[in-house]
C-alpha cells in the first residue's frame, strides 16, 4: 500500500492506494468517531463491493446503514441527493455519523455534498471504485450536483477524512469507464508534469490492459500532483483552475448532449483535443506537441471529435462555465507539457477550433 497525504493543515487527510483495501478495517477505524455509519453507493457497485465494506466496518461495532442510488450521471441531481437525506433522517443520523462514498465520481460528489449540507456538516470518507474517481474526483473536496443548465454548478468545497483507493476495484470496470479515467491521468501529466506525460505515452497500452503496477503508479502520481495543487489553492482561486484543462469544452459536450450520454472522462478527453487545437491557433503550443496529445488520447480509446452541437450552442454552454467572468469564457491552454495558461480566446479562434474538432 502507498499513502499520499493532502496537506491542508488540521484538515489534512491520507489517500491510501493499493489492492484489497476495501476490506481493511484499520484504514477506516481512525476516521469514524460516532456510533453510526451510512454507506452511499449505487445499484452497480453495491453488489460488487458493498458486502466487503460492511464486513470491514463490522469489527468497529457501529450501526451501519446503506443508501443505494440509481447509477449514472443522469441521476446527479436534487432528486437523488434527497434520497441520501431521506436515508440519513430515517436512520436518525447525527452530527457524528460518518458517510462513506462507495462508487465513482457521481457517488463521491453527491455524498460529499450531502455530508457538507447534512446538519451543516458531517464527516465522510471516499472509497472510489473507478479510475477517474481514484485519480481525480475523490481528491480535493469538490462536491456537488449538476443543473440542467450547467455541470457541477451547485456544490461546496468539503474535504473528506480519508480516501481509500482500492486498485482491485478496477478489475470490474467497463472498458469505457477505464478509458474515461485514463483521460484524467493524461490531463494531469499534460498540465503539470512533462516526465509523467512521457510515461503515460509509453504505458498507455499497459493502462488499457489494466496492469496492476502501472495502474498503481498512474493513481499515485496523479494523486501526488493533485494533492500539491489543492494544498496550494484549495478553493480554486488561481492555480487549481489548471486541473480543468479540457473541461470547458468537455462540460459543454456533456450538458449539450444530456448528462450521461458521454462519460465525463470521454468529454474531457475530447475537450483536451479541442483545447490543444486552440492552444496551437493562439501560438502557444507547437504542432508536434498537439499531435502527441491527440495520439495518446486516441490510444486510450477516447473520442477525438466532438458532437456537432453548433458553434452558437457551444458558446452558450461554455459561458455558463464556472471559470467564466462577466460572460467571457476562460480556457485552460497549453504552452508545453507541464506549463499552462488561463486566458480568454477570440471568438474567431474558438469557432475555427470547433469547426475542425466537431463532426
Swiss-Prot record:
GO terms for molecular function: 3-dehydroquinate synthase activity; metal ion binding; nucleotide binding. It catalyses: 7-phospho-2-dehydro-3-deoxy-D-arabino-heptonate = 3-dehydroquinate + phosphate. GO terms for cellular component: cytoplasm. Pathway: Metabolic intermediate biosynthesis; chorismate biosynthesis; chorismate from D-erythrose 4-phosphate and phosphoenolpyruvate: step 2/7. Zn(2+) binds at residues 184, 247, 264. Its EC number is 4.2.3.4. Transmembrane segments: none annotated. InterPro entries: Dehydroquinate_synthase, DHQ_synth_AroB, DHQ_synth_fam, DHQS/DOIS_N, DHQS_C. Binds 1 divalent metal cation per subunit. Can use either Co(2+) or Zn(2+). It is an enzyme of class 4 (lyase). Catalyzes the conversion of 3-deoxy-D-arabino-heptulosonate 7-phosphate (DAHP) to dehydroquinate (DHQ). HAMAP family: DHQ_synthase. This is 3-dehydroquinate synthase.
Amino acid at each position: 500500500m502507498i499513502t499520499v497525504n493532502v496537506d491542508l493543515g488540521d484538515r489534512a487527510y491520507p489517500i491510501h492506494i493499493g489492492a484489497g483495501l476495501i476490506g481493511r478495517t484499520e484504514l477506516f477505524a481512525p476516521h469514524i468517531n460516532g456510533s453510526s455509519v451510512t454507506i452511499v453507493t449505487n445499484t452497480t457497485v453495491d453488489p460488487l463491493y458493498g458486502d466487503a465494506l460492511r464486513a470491514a466496518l463490522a469489527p468497529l461495532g457501529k450501526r451501519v446503514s446503506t443508501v443505494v442510488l440509481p447509477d449514472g450521471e443522469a441521476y446527479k441531481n436534487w432528486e437523488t441527493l434527497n434520497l441520501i437525506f431521506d436515508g440519513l433522517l430515517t436512520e436518525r443520523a447525527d452530527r457524528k455519523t460518518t458517510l462513506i462514498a462507495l462508487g465513482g465520481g457521481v457517488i463521491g460528489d453527491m455524498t460529499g455534498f450531502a455530508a457538507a449540507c447534512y446538519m451543516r456538516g458531517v464527516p465522510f470518507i471516499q472509497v472510489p471504485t473507478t479510475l477517474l474517481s481514484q485519480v481525480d474526483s475523490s481528491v480535493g473536496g469538490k462536491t456537488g450536483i449538476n443543473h440542467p443548465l450547467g455541470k457541477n454548478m451547485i456544490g461546496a468545497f468539503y474535504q473528506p477524512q480519508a480516501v481509500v483507493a482500492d486498485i482491485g476495484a478496477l478489475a470490474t470496470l467497463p472498458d469505457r469507464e477505464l478509458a474515461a479515467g485514463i483521460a484524467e491521468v493524461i490531463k494531469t501529466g499534460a498540465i503539470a508534469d512533462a516526465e509523467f506525460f512521457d510515461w503515460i505515452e509509453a504505458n498507455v497500452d499497459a493502462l488499457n490492459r489494466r496492469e496492476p503496477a502501472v495502474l498503481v503508479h498512474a493513481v499515485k502520481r496523479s494523486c501526488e500532483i493533485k494533492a500539491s495543487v489543492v494544498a496550494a489553492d484549495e478553493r480554486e482561486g488561481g492555480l487549481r483552475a489548471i486541473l480543468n484543462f479540457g473541461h470547458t469544452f468537455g462540460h459543454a459536450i456533456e450538458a449539450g448532449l444530456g448528462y450521461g450520454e458521454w462519460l465525463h472522462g470521454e468529454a474531457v478527453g475530447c475537450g483536451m483535443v479541442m483545447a490543444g487545437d486552440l492552444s496551437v491557433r493562439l501560438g502557444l503550443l507547437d504542432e508536434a506537441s498537439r499531435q502527441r496529445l491527440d495520439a495518446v488520447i486516441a490510444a486510450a480509446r477516447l473520442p477525438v471529435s466532438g458532437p456537432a452541437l453548433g458553434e452558437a450552442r457551444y458558446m452558450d454552454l461554455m459561458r455558463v462555465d464556472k471559470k467564466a467572468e462577466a460572460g467571457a469564457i476562460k480556457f485552460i491552454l497549453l504552452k508545453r507539457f507541464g506549463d499552462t495558461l488561463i486566458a480568454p480566446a477570440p471568438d474567431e479562434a474558438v469557432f475555427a477550433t470547433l469547426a475542425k474538432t466537431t463532426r
